[in-house]
Design a protein with these regions (language model features):
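Short polybasic amphipathic segments
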Residues: 307-313
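Residue-level signal for inorganic ion chemistry
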Residues: 106, 110, 138, 149, ...
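N-terminal capping segment at the start of a domain
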Residues: 104, 108-132
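Oxyanion/phosphate-interacting regions
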Residues: 2-107, 115, 275-295, 314-325, ...
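Multi-pass membrane proteins that catalyze or facilitate reactions on polyprenyl-/lipid-phosphate substrates
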Residues: 169-193, 310, 324-326, 336-340, ...
Length: 467
């Protein structure tokens, strides 16, 4: 129903992502002494794109959903079941700003290490207890991000749960490795002013670096605030010169409130996501970035309840990060027809059953070949509208870790998509290190229609699968 009202508005300049916006709080008086408080934001281009509305009327708990593409008329639907964000506008802005800068720095660090890994041999690889490769980049990113968050937000205010521990690195026979990590961290932190952050007064010593890594010892859980960090997600992709991600999320009282995903090798053209990394490197070399363009790499970020997700290019060469660094909004794809949809899954069939997803793809009418990509770059692909579906069905008994999903999930949700387990329930980030209670697998989709088709297909085929 169209809304006719006389209103009283206060305008506040506001920035979340790339475009300058004006945030307006409007009080709309209605009959019976009640009033609405409307929070809306208007872009420079005059499009109103997000609004929240609360009705303050005695004996009423109704909530409403507004949608509008221009600032003059609203379409209002009753949506009693819809949960609106209760976040104040601007909440977590400082944390988001710092997190994006920290992830930009982490991407810069990773790019340097990956380049040297590819040009050298595998001498910089070290086997973890589970035999997965871990590199200098994992520890260096963890130390760098931990140090930045502690310095800027105060170490007493910062709790971090992260993938790496210091055991291997602290061993007597790891002195060379530790030295390389300390050097990498200091080289990166020396560049902090380029990213709008303060560099340490003097270089960090090995004990400070070990301290920064081991400070990431939060166990997560349902209460309070903690960061979840995957310093290099998709380590296998990283060591192969392929896709990987740096993932940082802020979780408060069990809910993800901020997500920042750095994808240093995300190609400018989505078709290149499916190219073998060697081709991509050749193409990158043939088309060097000009001062106006960037050939790969982005940081995507969002804040819970904002209804928007943003993408910044990585800063190139010796340039400075000027906030928000040419950020552009990202939105999920509008494709609903399975025949036109692209689905992503892990490269490694050990991480997700390719045969089960092939069966699902067939039964819902997906026609394209799966897009197999390492790491949380798959979440980025959905949020950017470059693919429509991400499915992961790990073997029975495997427990998904929160840092492998938190940032990607919130980014897809705020970009307009849907992410649940295969039973249609939200992923639960409140149970510590693992996504406890996850039903069968993870399904992320650009839209609810595709999502429903896939969850139904899972139900229909699960019992006859070997999973
Ligand atoms: N057996 C297994 N089943 C499912 N996921 C696994 C797995 N072993 C490792 N993983 C997770 O899958 C992530 C890689 O994702 P993908 O397969 O999509 O590239 C790994 O992140 P790390 O590389 O950070 O350890 C790890 O957390
Ligand atoms: Mg990971």
């Amino acid at each position: 129903m169209p809304l006719n009202c006389s209103s009283l508005a206060t305008k506040v300049p506001h920035t979340l992502g790339g475009l300058k916006t004006t945030a307006t709080t409007t009080t709309i008086h209605v009959g019976g002494g009640g009033f609405f408080n409307l929070f809306s934001k208007t872009h420079q281009n005059n499009s109103l794109y997000i609004a929240s509305l609360s009705l303050n009327k005695r004996n009423s708990s109704q909530r409403y959903c507004l949608s509008s593409s221009s600032s003059s008329s609203f379409v209002m639907e009753d949506t009693k079941d819809m949960v609106f964000s209760t976040l104040e506008p601007g909440k977590y802005s400082k944390e988001l700003d710092i997190a994006v800068r920290a992830v930009q720095m982490a991407c810069f660090l990773c790019q340097k290490v990956q380049e040297s890994l590819i040009s050298k041999t595998t001498s910089q690889l070290q086997a973890k207890d589970d035999n997965s490769p871990v590199t200098i980049a994992d520890w260096s990113v963890q130390a760098t991000v931990s140090w930045i968050l502690s310095e800027t937000l105060g170490s007493r205010n910062v709790a971090i749960i992260a993938e790496e521990d210091v055991q291997t690195l602290s061993k007597a026979d790891s002195a060379g490795l530790l030295e390389a990590v300390v050097q990498t961290v200091n080289d990166c932190l020396a560049e902090a002013p380029r990213f709008g952050l303060k560099a340490p007064g003097t270089s960090l010593g090995s004990s400070e670096v070990l301290e920064a890594i081991s400070r990431c010892n939060s166990t997560g859980g349902p209460n309070g605030r903690f960061w979840a960090l995957d310093p290099v997600d998709g380590t296998l992709g990283f060591v192969r010169g392929d896709q990987y991600a740096v993932a940082l999320a802020l979780i408060e009282d069990g809910e993800v409130v901020l997500g920042v995903l750095g994808c240093p090798n995300y190609p400018m053209r989505k078709e290149w996501l499916s190219y073998h990394h060697r081709y991509h490197r050749i193409i990158s070399k043939l088309t060097p970035p000009t001062s106006e363009s960037w050939d790969k790499g982005c940081v995507i970020y969002t804040r819970r309840g904002s209804g928007e997700a943003w993408m910044q290019p990585l800063i190139q060469g010796h340039k400075k990060l000027v906030w928000p660094n040419s950020a552009t909004p990202v939105k999920v794809s509008t494709i609903e027809n399975p025949a036109l949809a692209t689905f992503c899954e892990p490269v490694e069939k050990a991480n997700s059953s390719h045969s089960f997803t092939a069966g699902l793809a067939h039964s819902v009418g997906l026609r394209k070949q799966p897009l197999r990509v390492y790491s949380m770059v798959k979440y980025a692909a959905i949020a950017r509208g470059d693919a429509e579906i991400f499915m992961k069905f790990a073997r029975a008994g495997y427990k998904e870790k929160i840092w492998d999903h938190a940032a990607g999930v919130i980014i897809i949700q705020e970009a307009g998509g849907v992410v649940t387990d295969a039973g249609g329930r939200p992923l639960d980030f409140s149970k510590g290190m693992y996504l406890e209670g996850l039903d069968r697998g993870i399904i992320a989709c650009a839209g609810a229609k595709l999502h429903e088709k896939i969850t139904r297909a899972v139900d229909a085929s699960w019992n006859s699968s070997s999973l």
